[in-house]
């Protein structure tokens, strides 16, 4: 539901991975005066993306909040905090995490699909529950590693990076034509040194008032203990 100042986001999903599980998400964005907006989001059993191992066998209960300040129309400041409880898809508790992210950016234009550059810094703290994994989660652990919760929970890190984004569409805004979008960036963290992210995709309508998005992403950074990860993403959104 979208009102004059407030936008609500309600979502439910069913995931097929190591185990099948449902998820719920509820969030709100509230627009204040002078280009300032506040937002929050609560999640139950949603996919955990803080590491590739969590993405494969984990999920999270999370709460995030923050604000976005559109300073001049092209320059902006965004701050977000996240509190996360990590669980295996079998239901076993794995640990928890807290992150703070600060973005300072500049848009090159005022179009709905904005192109811009941003400086981003993140501080992330993680704590693993100190106990062995159950048999199903242990099946994901290589034979030379200990089968405990440390396998899933990433290291705490501090990271700063510069990123160029282009062609990004606002989720709630319909677009009539197909467009390319992507992100290129470099970063450095205190745990894994220099890293990068590269993402390229296309999105546009298929049947009319809808949007299909296809993209590929490859990254290597402190967010995943310096490990390289690749993702192929397909999303479909129907407007009404």
Report residues per predicted region.
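Gram-negative and organellar
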Residues: 1-240
